[in-house]
Amino acid sequence: MTGQCCEELQRAPKPRMALRTKKGLKGSIEDVLGDLLGDDTTPPEKPAEPASHAKDTASSPQWQASKAKFLPKDSVEGLAGADAEASSVSDADPQVFLQNMKDLDSMDDDLFGRMKSHQPSGKGAAKGPGKEGPSNHKPAGTLTANEKGYTMPTKKPPPSSSKTGLQYKKFSFEDFEDPLAGLLSDEEEETATKLPAVERKPAPKSPGAAAGQGPSVPLTPGDTPIRKKELLFDEGDDIMTTLGFEDSPKAERKKTGDQEGPLPARSKLDELLGRGTAAKLLTRPGTGERREFQLDKKYQKMGGEESVPARDKEDSWDDETLTFGAYKPTVASSEGRQSRRQSVSRFLGEGGPDPKGESLGFKQSSPPASSPIHPRKGGADWLGLKDNDLDLLSPSPVQKAQQEDSPMTPSLLPPTNQPSAPEPQSAPTGLPSAAKPPAKGARPSLKASQASSPKASEEKEDDWLSHVISQKKSQNLAREERAGPPKDLASLGSLGQTPSGSLPVAQVLEQAPAGEASKPTTQGMAAVRPGVTGSSMSWSQATTVLPVDDPKKGAASASGDFSSREPAVYIPHSQEPTGLSVPIQTLLPESMMQSLLPGSGYQKQLLAAQGQLQSSTAQLQVELLQSQTKLSELEAQVRKLELERAQHRMLLESLQQRHQADLELIEDAHRSRIKVLETSYQQREEQLRREKEVLSAQHASYCREAEQARAELVAQHQRQMAMAEQERDQEVARLRELQQASILEMRKDHEHQLQRLKMLKDQEIDAVTSATSHTRSLNGIIEQMEKFSSSLNTLSSRVEASHLTTSQQRELGIRQQDEQLRALQERLGRQQRDMEEERNRLQEVIGKMEVRLSEQSRLLEQERWRVAAEKTKAESAQRTLEEQRKIMVQQIAMEREELERAKSALLEEQKSVMNKCGEERRRLAAEWAEYFTQQKLSKERAEREAERAMHADSQREGTIISLTKEQAELTVRACELRAKEEKLLAEREALERERQELRLEKDRLHKASLRLQARAQEVEHMSKVASKKYEEGEQALQEAQQMQNEQQGRLQVVQRQQEWLRQQEQRVHQEHLSLAQQRLQLDRVRQEVPASLPGLPPRVQGPAASSRDAVQAPASSSPQCSQPAAAQVPTHLLAKLLLLKHTAEEDHDFLENEQFFLETLKKAPYNMAYHSA
């Protein structure tokens, strides 16, 4: 947790970051960091709340106890209010600081007799800032230039002066409230609420700011502010130089070295842990900028009126003493004295009649713009000079240093970056009623000086900044020449004008001790930083007003002298407890103050001596502080490192445990995932196998159904074809029968007519031959012929009608048959298309089956190769195992033989040993018997026997020992043999297990080979089935092609028959035409015959004429040949010839008609459709 706290402190954009990280720490960490950082409670949002004071007091008991030893009660109570604006971070152990302050208190008691005579005034002043200070906090990055100004020294400021002003502004309190907010935005606000902000601004300027960068309260030389955060002075802090007691170039080198750039984020932790230097932090600009402070116009006017007489008294100064141009400061100094400091007050417009002088004085308050720390900003942007808001401007560190360090400065710099909190509270608490109106009246003068100064400062900003750099060396030289009483008088004179909020009391503390005030004195006066007013009060007036025996009298005289023309007269003693808790009597004893009245030379000497004495004591204090700070820093680092080590150890253990748990979780998850994958893949394989079986079954059933459907369709088609053929054959047979019957009837009629015609011909011949005698018979013949022709016509019409009716009936029947045949043909076409589609599908299926068969065959080959390889591997492994087994058997047999031999040898040895033992026992028994017998004989012999027995005993013991050794060796060897036997048994068991594993592997391989064989058989079966299906498809295709060829052959036959019928019809038609021509010729002959026979009666000519008219047209083509023939041939022969021709033509026509009818029957559409089908 300590490492976390340190990281958060490093990332903190402001010191208050440590407060947020502190809230989550435990008790032990709080104790450790309480030692490191002091009380780390956050500064309250509203400083007036007493809870924050109680918390601060409770969190730092040692701090409070150490203060109580040497701080007055009133001062301690007054400091409680100022704690609200105190720093949240300190650079040193507060105990060390307080111990150092005790020594300073004793020294100040010796120097200044009446040091604590007016300490009760600090009570009201200390309580002011927390109660009436504005409560609006600025964020971490929004501090104005006024707050940044005191942390930015110029490039080469005087060593002592820069340190005096800078060391106490090490910390920029970004978390504190803006004391100017709410005071400057509203011009109509009451002056009682405006004065606290103006008086609280200069507080950080005094050395009290070293204890905390917030506004502090006026303190006596022994007072030390009670802060929320303890001070931790770094080893690099030059305390003596900061307090104004050191003029060594070392401080300047430190400060200029620290100005090289902004500090990194690491410096935050350095500040919190006391490892940084105050000078480094002073070179860093604040993270925010305060706005320019401008007073109301009524206050500016009042301040301007006061400064008119003061300006007249400043004309005696030399022009070389003016830092920025020809401007003369508003506060008077002794004649002939040169001031090295800028007589800069942001409210200098109150002391001069012309606005130009006011702007110059206003511009002199911002030399920090020339500091190289912030080259990014323009000349005085960081000071807020170009802002139009009403906040105060920030004084540069050089100006603060000059105000607190130079004894010759007649005009004091207004530290406007932080409010002088104590003064606004002094008026209500300890100021008399007569002193309050002047304090309120000081505000118009401040407003007036700033109303005219911002514009002029913007116009002459560049010249002013360049002039600041040029005046630095002259300021360093002039600083040594200015030590003397005029500074004291000027400071004392300016103290009466401090209610306007422009004169820091730190300068009074510097000027009173001959240019450099002691550290306690400057700390006590840190919070009492009233602004410089515009009244030009002379040094003589200052000496008559302030150096009085009684602080009350001095305050009264000061207020009385300046009340008439100074509306912002400040009462510096107990009457103004918040504004001047450290009066002039705190700096000098009353006797010394009285001795200062006659002349300024004696005051110079006295103040110089006091400054030297305090500078020497301050150096010793600084060394002590540095050593103690370093010690506390080292202890803090050791505690921090121990905490970090413990925390890292705990973190490492937790990380190891977490890592182990993560590893276990990962392994468990991996195992579970592997199991899930195995089960999922097994399920998927099973599912695919089932799907394959289902698909194969579906395919087989689909093939069977397709075959059945095809067989049904083929059978149905064949049945339909057979039925159509039968119907066609029946129809053709019926038509043939009808035609034959009609032909028979027509033949009969024709024969009958031929017979009649023959009879008529015979009769006509007889009549012609006997024309003369048979005229009547001829007429009868003619009538018969006419009757015959009429009957023939009726017969022909009847035949034609019958032909029409039969043809219509036949056409209807034929149309129906054609429709049926067309439907059958369409069905046949659909069936053919279906057969084509089925054939294509079968071809596709056959192709797929071939591809699958090839793939399966390829896989089968691969599987066969793999199985063969596995078989070879298994066989080789089996052979090697067999060889190993043989070798092991041989080894085991050899070892068994060796074991048997060893056993036999051991048994033999045991037997020999037992035999030897038995022999020895027997020998011993014999010896004992001999011994007893010999013992009885004589003593000598007994002795010899005894010796012999002893010798035998020793031998026996030796033999027994050797036997025991041999037996032990045998037992060891037996144990070894037993161990070897157990090892052999274990190896045999391992071999058995390996054999079982091999057997299992062999079984598995056998099962795999069986599965592969079964799969190969299935594949072969599938290939056979596919080939069978392919052959069946091919057969079906061939049958379909054969049927198509048969249908095409039938169509060709029908087409040939149609062609033949068409030819027959043409012939019949030609025959009919020839018969018609013959009839016409016969009619013509009939007409010509009566013309050649004059004896014919006229009634015979009527029918003859009609017949002639009927046949006249066809016979007109050959009239010439008929006439000569009639003329040459006898008429009866010609008549017979004509009759024969006529009958021949009729017969020919009849035959042609019959032939045409047959051809039309053959050319009927149903016959064509049937044959084409």
UniProtKB/Swiss-Prot annotation:
Coiled-coil residue spans: 617-742, 808-917, 975-1057
Cellular component GO terms held in the UniProt record: apical junction complex; centriole; centrosome; ciliary basal body; ciliary transition fiber; cytoplasm; keratin filament; spindle pole
Modified residue annotations for Phosphoserine: S172
DNA repair recorded as keyword: no
Compositionally skewed regions (Polar residues) per UniProt: 331-345, 396-411, 468-477, 533-544
Cross-link Glycyl lysine isopeptide (Lys-Gly) (interchain with G-Cter in SUMO2) placement: K1002
Compositional bias ranges of the Basic and acidic residues kind: 46-56, 247-258, 287-299
Subcellular localization: Cytoplasm, Cytoskeleton, Microtubule organizing center, Centrosome, Centriole; Cytoplasm, Cytoskeleton, Spindle pole; Cell junction
Pfam families xref list: FBF1
Keywords for the protein's UniProt record, in alphabetical order: Cell junction, Cilium biogenesis/degradation, Coiled coil, Cytoplasm, Cytoskeleton, Isopeptide bond, Phosphoprotein, Ubl conjugation
Low complexity: compositionally biased ranges: 80-93, 206-216, 1110-1124
Summary of subunit composition and partner proteins: Interacts with PARD3. May interact with FAS cytoplasmic domain. Interacts with TRAPPC14.
Job of this protein: Keratin-binding protein required for epithelial cell polarization. Involved in apical junction complex (AJC) assembly via its interaction with PARD3. Required for ciliogenesis.
Name this polypeptide is given: Fas-binding factor 1
Gene behind the chain: Fbf1
